Amino acid sequence: MPKPSIRGSELPQRQSPRLRTSLLSTSSDPHHLSRPITDRSPKLGLDRRSPRSGGPHTDPLSQKKLGSRISGLESQLGQAQEELRLLKQQLAKAEAAKKRAQEELHRKKSKKPNTPAPERDDIPGDGHQETDVFEVLDEKAKESEKTKNDELASKEDQINVLKARLYDLEKERVSLSEENETLKDQLKKTDTEMSCAKAKEDEIASKVSQIGEELEESNETTAKLKKKLESVEEAKETLEAEMKKLKVQTEQWRKAADAAAAVLSGGVEMNGRFSEQCGSMEKHFAGRFVGSPGMADDSDDGSGKRKSSGKKMFGDLWKKKGQK
Protein backbone atom coordinates (compact mmCIF):
# COMPACT_ATOMS: atom_id res chain seq x y z
CA MET A 1 0.00 0.00 0.00
CA PRO A 2 2.78 2.58 0.52
CA LYS A 3 3.84 1.95 -3.05
CA PRO A 4 1.14 4.05 -4.73
CA SER A 5 1.66 6.85 -2.24
CA ILE A 6 5.31 7.03 -3.20
CA ARG A 7 4.38 7.09 -6.89
CA GLY A 8 1.84 9.79 -6.23
CA SER A 9 4.37 11.95 -4.44
CA GLU A 10 6.80 11.73 -7.37
CA LEU A 11 4.20 12.61 -10.01
CA PRO A 12 4.08 16.43 -9.75
CA GLN A 13 7.83 16.75 -9.70
CA ARG A 14 8.19 15.44 -13.25
CA GLN A 15 8.62 18.14 -15.84
CA SER A 16 9.00 17.99 -19.57
CA PRO A 17 12.65 18.41 -20.56
CA ARG A 18 11.62 20.16 -23.79
CA LEU A 19 9.65 22.78 -21.88
CA ARG A 20 12.46 23.40 -19.43
CA THR A 21 15.01 23.76 -22.26
CA SER A 22 12.80 26.17 -24.19
CA LEU A 23 12.18 28.27 -21.11
CA LEU A 24 15.87 28.44 -20.35
CA SER A 25 16.73 29.34 -23.94
CA THR A 26 14.21 32.18 -24.09
CA SER A 27 14.81 33.57 -20.60
CA SER A 28 18.55 32.98 -20.24
CA ASP A 29 19.41 36.50 -21.48
CA PRO A 30 16.92 38.95 -19.95
CA HIS A 31 19.16 41.93 -20.66
CA HIS A 32 19.18 41.07 -24.33
CA LEU A 33 15.39 41.28 -24.41
CA SER A 34 15.05 44.37 -22.29
CA ARG A 35 17.90 46.57 -23.44
CA PRO A 36 16.89 49.49 -25.70
CA ILE A 37 17.27 49.52 -29.42
CA THR A 38 19.84 52.30 -29.42
CA ASP A 39 22.26 50.11 -27.44
CA ARG A 40 22.32 47.53 -30.18
CA SER A 41 22.29 50.04 -33.01
CA PRO A 42 24.06 53.20 -31.91
CA LYS A 43 23.86 54.72 -35.36
CA LEU A 44 20.08 54.63 -35.57
CA GLY A 45 19.74 57.69 -33.36
CA LEU A 46 21.75 59.89 -35.70
CA ASP A 47 20.35 62.92 -37.38
CA ARG A 48 18.63 61.77 -40.53
CA ARG A 49 17.83 65.12 -42.04
CA SER A 50 18.43 65.10 -45.71
CA PRO A 51 21.06 67.60 -46.89
CA ARG A 52 19.93 70.45 -49.02
CA SER A 53 20.60 70.14 -52.70
CA GLY A 54 23.33 72.42 -53.95
CA GLY A 55 21.72 73.45 -57.41
CA PRO A 56 23.22 73.24 -60.76
CA HIS A 57 26.77 74.10 -59.49
CA THR A 58 27.10 71.45 -56.77
CA ASP A 59 30.48 71.31 -54.99
CA PRO A 60 32.25 67.93 -55.40
CA LEU A 61 32.93 67.97 -51.65
CA SER A 62 29.20 68.06 -50.87
CA GLN A 63 28.64 65.24 -53.36
CA LYS A 64 31.34 63.22 -51.59
CA LYS A 65 29.64 63.89 -48.25
CA LEU A 66 26.33 62.82 -49.79
CA GLY A 67 27.86 59.58 -51.01
CA SER A 68 29.38 58.85 -47.57
CA ARG A 69 26.01 59.65 -45.99
CA ILE A 70 24.28 57.17 -48.30
CA SER A 71 26.82 54.45 -47.49
CA GLY A 72 26.34 55.15 -43.77
CA LEU A 73 22.58 54.91 -44.13
CA GLU A 74 22.90 51.67 -46.07
CA SER A 75 25.05 50.19 -43.30
CA GLN A 76 22.49 51.36 -40.71
CA LEU A 77 19.70 49.86 -42.80
CA GLY A 78 21.54 46.55 -43.00
CA GLN A 79 22.12 46.60 -39.25
CA ALA A 80 18.45 47.35 -38.60
CA GLN A 81 17.39 44.54 -40.91
CA GLU A 82 19.73 42.14 -39.09
CA GLU A 83 18.29 43.18 -35.72
CA LEU A 84 14.80 42.79 -37.15
CA ARG A 85 15.64 39.28 -38.27
CA LEU A 86 17.03 38.40 -34.83
CA LEU A 87 13.96 39.81 -33.11
CA LYS A 88 11.71 37.81 -35.42
CA GLN A 89 13.66 34.69 -34.53
CA GLN A 90 13.35 35.48 -30.82
CA LEU A 91 9.64 36.14 -31.23
CA ALA A 92 9.19 32.83 -33.04
CA LYS A 93 11.09 31.02 -30.30
CA ALA A 94 9.04 32.72 -27.59
CA GLU A 95 5.78 31.87 -29.32
CA ALA A 96 6.94 28.26 -29.75
CA ALA A 97 7.88 28.10 -26.07
CA LYS A 98 4.50 29.58 -25.14
CA LYS A 99 2.75 27.01 -27.29
CA ARG A 100 4.73 24.17 -25.76
CA ALA A 101 4.00 25.46 -22.25
CA GLN A 102 0.29 25.69 -23.05
CA GLU A 103 0.32 22.18 -24.44
CA GLU A 104 2.16 20.90 -21.36
CA LEU A 105 -0.28 22.65 -19.05
CA HIS A 106 -3.23 21.30 -20.98
CA ARG A 107 -1.71 17.87 -20.84
CA LYS A 108 -1.19 18.18 -17.08
CA LYS A 109 -4.75 19.33 -16.58
CA SER A 110 -6.23 16.58 -18.69
CA LYS A 111 -4.06 13.94 -17.10
CA LYS A 112 -5.76 12.80 -13.87
CA PRO A 113 -3.84 10.76 -11.32
CA ASN A 114 -4.81 7.10 -11.24
CA THR A 115 -5.80 6.74 -7.62
CA PRO A 116 -6.40 3.12 -6.53
CA ALA A 117 -9.77 2.36 -5.04
CA PRO A 118 -9.58 1.69 -1.30
CA GLU A 119 -10.09 -1.92 -0.34
CA ARG A 120 -12.62 -2.86 2.22
CA ASP A 121 -10.15 -4.87 4.20
CA ASP A 122 -7.81 -1.84 4.62
CA ILE A 123 -7.43 -0.47 8.03
CA PRO A 124 -8.71 3.06 8.76
CA GLY A 125 -5.21 4.46 9.13
CA ASP A 126 -4.33 3.57 5.54
CA GLY A 127 -7.34 5.54 4.20
CA HIS A 128 -6.28 8.63 6.07
CA GLN A 129 -2.77 8.28 4.68
CA GLU A 130 -4.06 8.02 1.10
CA THR A 131 -6.20 11.12 1.66
CA ASP A 132 -3.09 13.03 2.73
CA VAL A 133 -1.24 11.83 -0.35
CA PHE A 134 -4.06 13.05 -2.63
CA GLU A 135 -4.09 16.42 -0.89
CA VAL A 136 -0.35 16.76 -1.38
CA LEU A 137 -0.69 15.80 -5.03
CA ASP A 138 -3.48 18.32 -5.47
CA GLU A 139 -1.45 21.09 -3.86
CA LYS A 140 1.58 20.28 -5.97
CA ALA A 141 -0.54 20.19 -9.10
CA LYS A 142 -1.99 23.60 -8.20
CA GLU A 143 1.49 24.97 -7.58
CA SER A 144 2.72 23.54 -10.86
CA GLU A 145 -0.27 25.03 -12.66
CA LYS A 146 0.37 28.40 -11.02
CA THR A 147 4.02 28.23 -12.05
CA LYS A 148 3.00 27.41 -15.59
CA ASN A 149 0.54 30.28 -15.62
CA ASP A 150 3.21 32.64 -14.34
CA GLU A 151 5.59 31.41 -17.00
CA LEU A 152 2.92 31.85 -19.64
CA ALA A 153 2.21 35.40 -18.43
CA SER A 154 5.94 36.14 -18.51
CA LYS A 155 6.15 34.74 -22.02
CA GLU A 156 3.15 36.84 -23.02
CA ASP A 157 4.89 39.96 -21.69
CA GLN A 158 8.10 39.07 -23.47
CA ILE A 159 6.21 38.45 -26.69
CA ASN A 160 4.44 41.81 -26.38
CA VAL A 161 7.75 43.57 -25.75
CA LEU A 162 9.31 41.82 -28.73
CA LYS A 163 6.34 42.74 -30.92
CA ALA A 164 6.60 46.39 -29.84
CA ARG A 165 10.31 46.44 -30.59
CA LEU A 166 9.70 44.63 -33.83
CA TYR A 167 7.18 47.31 -34.79
CA ASP A 168 9.64 50.08 -33.85
CA LEU A 169 12.41 48.42 -35.82
CA GLU A 170 10.12 48.00 -38.80
CA LYS A 171 9.26 51.70 -38.67
CA GLU A 172 12.95 52.52 -38.35
CA ARG A 173 13.76 50.32 -41.32
CA VAL A 174 11.05 51.95 -43.45
CA SER A 175 12.29 55.41 -42.47
CA LEU A 176 15.88 54.50 -43.29
CA SER A 177 14.80 52.97 -46.60
CA GLU A 178 12.85 56.09 -47.55
CA GLU A 179 15.73 58.37 -46.57
CA ASN A 180 18.16 56.17 -48.44
CA GLU A 181 16.00 56.34 -51.56
CA THR A 182 15.71 60.12 -51.16
CA LEU A 183 19.47 60.49 -50.87
CA LYS A 184 19.97 58.24 -53.89
CA ASP A 185 17.54 60.39 -55.87
CA GLN A 186 19.42 63.50 -54.74
CA LEU A 187 22.70 61.89 -55.75
CA LYS A 188 21.29 61.04 -59.18
CA LYS A 189 19.96 64.58 -59.52
CA THR A 190 23.34 65.97 -58.48
CA ASP A 191 25.09 63.74 -61.00
CA THR A 192 22.70 64.92 -63.71
CA GLU A 193 23.23 68.56 -62.75
CA MET A 194 26.99 68.08 -62.73
CA SER A 195 26.82 66.42 -66.15
CA CYS A 196 24.77 69.34 -67.49
CA ALA A 197 27.17 71.82 -65.88
CA LYS A 198 30.14 69.98 -67.39
CA ALA A 199 28.47 70.00 -70.81
CA LYS A 200 27.80 73.74 -70.47
CA GLU A 201 31.37 74.27 -69.34
CA ASP A 202 32.67 72.40 -72.38
CA GLU A 203 30.35 74.41 -74.62
CA ILE A 204 31.52 77.68 -73.05
CA ALA A 205 35.15 76.57 -73.38
CA SER A 206 34.54 75.81 -77.06
CA LYS A 207 32.91 79.22 -77.55
CA VAL A 208 35.80 80.91 -75.73
CA SER A 209 38.28 79.09 -77.96
CA GLN A 210 36.31 80.10 -81.05
CA ILE A 211 36.13 83.70 -79.83
CA GLY A 212 39.88 83.59 -79.19
CA GLU A 213 40.51 82.45 -82.75
CA GLU A 214 38.19 85.15 -84.07
CA LEU A 215 39.99 87.69 -81.89
CA GLU A 216 43.34 86.60 -83.30
CA GLU A 217 41.96 86.90 -86.83
CA SER A 218 40.53 90.30 -85.94
CA ASN A 219 43.90 91.37 -84.54
CA GLU A 220 45.61 90.24 -87.72
CA THR A 221 43.01 92.08 -89.81
CA THR A 222 43.46 95.16 -87.62
CA ALA A 223 47.22 95.00 -88.10
CA LYS A 224 46.76 94.73 -91.87
CA LEU A 225 44.28 97.61 -91.88
CA LYS A 226 46.67 99.63 -89.74
CA LYS A 227 49.46 99.06 -92.24
CA LYS A 228 47.11 100.01 -95.07
CA LEU A 229 46.07 103.09 -93.14
CA GLU A 230 49.71 104.05 -92.62
CA SER A 231 50.40 103.59 -96.33
CA VAL A 232 47.28 105.61 -97.14
CA GLU A 233 48.42 108.31 -94.72
CA GLU A 234 51.83 108.38 -96.41
CA ALA A 235 50.17 108.56 -99.82
CA LYS A 236 47.92 111.31 -98.51
CA GLU A 237 50.89 113.27 -97.22
CA THR A 238 52.63 112.78 -100.56
CA LEU A 239 49.53 113.94 -102.42
CA GLU A 240 49.17 116.91 -100.10
CA ALA A 241 52.80 117.87 -100.77
CA GLU A 242 52.20 117.52 -104.50
CA MET A 243 49.01 119.55 -104.16
CA LYS A 244 50.94 122.27 -102.39
CA LYS A 245 53.54 122.25 -105.13
CA LEU A 246 50.83 122.33 -107.77
CA LYS A 247 49.11 125.12 -105.91
CA VAL A 248 52.33 127.12 -105.82
CA GLN A 249 52.93 126.41 -109.50
CA THR A 250 49.35 127.32 -110.31
CA GLU A 251 49.74 130.55 -108.39
CA GLN A 252 52.94 131.24 -110.28
CA TRP A 253 51.25 130.43 -113.55
CA ARG A 254 48.37 132.72 -112.66
CA LYS A 255 50.74 135.55 -111.83
CA ALA A 256 52.64 134.94 -115.06
CA ALA A 257 49.38 134.89 -116.98
CA ASP A 258 48.34 138.13 -115.30
CA ALA A 259 51.69 139.68 -116.17
CA ALA A 260 51.45 138.45 -119.74
CA ALA A 261 47.93 139.74 -120.01
CA ALA A 262 49.12 143.07 -118.65
CA VAL A 263 51.95 143.16 -121.19
CA LEU A 264 49.61 142.21 -123.98
CA SER A 265 47.07 144.78 -122.94
CA GLY A 266 49.87 147.42 -122.76
CA GLY A 267 51.02 146.60 -126.31
CA VAL A 268 47.49 146.91 -127.62
CA GLU A 269 47.17 150.36 -126.06
CA MET A 270 50.48 151.44 -127.53
CA ASN A 271 49.40 150.12 -130.93
CA GLY A 272 46.16 152.05 -130.69
CA ARG A 273 47.95 155.26 -129.83
CA PHE A 274 50.40 154.78 -132.67
CA SER A 275 47.57 154.19 -135.13
CA GLU A 276 45.86 157.34 -133.94
CA GLN A 277 49.07 159.31 -134.44
CA CYS A 278 49.46 157.79 -137.86
CA GLY A 279 45.90 158.74 -138.76
CA SER A 280 46.45 162.32 -137.69
CA MET A 281 49.67 162.44 -139.65
CA GLU A 282 47.85 161.08 -142.66
CA LYS A 283 45.29 163.80 -142.28
CA HIS A 284 48.04 166.37 -141.88
CA PHE A 285 50.08 165.17 -144.76
CA ALA A 286 47.23 163.89 -146.90
CA GLY A 287 48.19 165.65 -149.99
CA ARG A 288 51.82 164.86 -149.82
CA PHE A 289 51.99 161.18 -148.59
CA VAL A 290 48.86 159.74 -150.11
CA GLY A 291 49.66 156.65 -152.17
CA SER A 292 53.25 156.44 -150.87
CA PRO A 293 54.13 152.77 -150.41
CA GLY A 294 56.97 153.41 -147.99
CA MET A 295 54.67 154.64 -145.19
CA ALA A 296 52.38 151.63 -145.39
CA ASP A 297 55.25 149.22 -145.16
CA ASP A 298 56.77 151.07 -142.20
CA SER A 299 53.50 150.94 -140.24
CA ASP A 300 53.07 147.24 -140.85
CA ASP A 301 56.62 146.47 -139.86
CA GLY A 302 56.33 148.51 -136.62
CA SER A 303 53.19 146.71 -135.41
CA GLY A 304 54.63 143.28 -136.26
CA LYS A 305 57.85 144.06 -134.39
CA ARG A 306 55.90 145.14 -131.32
CA LYS A 307 53.83 141.98 -131.38
CA SER A 308 56.89 139.75 -131.72
CA SER A 309 58.66 141.62 -128.93
CA GLY A 310 55.57 141.13 -126.66
CA LYS A 311 55.48 137.42 -127.40
CA LYS A 312 59.20 137.15 -126.71
CA MET A 313 58.78 138.97 -123.42
CA PHE A 314 55.85 136.66 -122.41
CA GLY A 315 57.95 133.59 -123.30
CA ASP A 316 60.88 134.87 -121.22
CA LEU A 317 58.59 135.52 -118.25
CA TRP A 318 57.02 132.08 -118.60
CA LYS A 319 60.45 130.41 -118.61
CA LYS A 320 61.55 132.35 -115.55
CA LYS A 321 58.39 131.36 -113.65
CA GLY A 322 58.86 127.74 -114.62
CA GLN A 323 62.48 127.78 -113.43
CA LYS A 324 61.43 129.26 -110.11
Swiss-Prot record:
Assigned keywords, A-Z: Coiled coil
Biased composition (Low complexity): 13-28
Entry superkingdom: Eukaryota
UniProt biased composition (Basic and acidic residues): 29-50, 95-106, 118-156, 313-324
Coiled-coil annotated residue ranges, if any: 62-266
InterPro entries hit by this protein: ICR
Annotated spans, Disordered: 1-74, 91-156, 175-201, 289-324
Complexes and interactors: Interacts with ARAC11 in vitro.
Function text: Acts as a scaffold, mediating interaction of ROPs with different proteins.
Family affiliation: Belongs to the ICR family.
PANTHER family: INTERACTOR OF CONSTITUTIVE ACTIVE ROPS 2, CHLOROPLASTIC-RELATED, INTERACTOR OF CONSTITUTIVE ACTIVE ROPS 4
Protein name: Interactor of constitutive active ROPs 4
Species in which this protein is naturally found: Arabidopsis thaliana
Organism placement in taxonomy: Eukaryota, Viridiplantae, Streptophyta, Embryophyta, Tracheophyta
Gene name of the record: ICR4
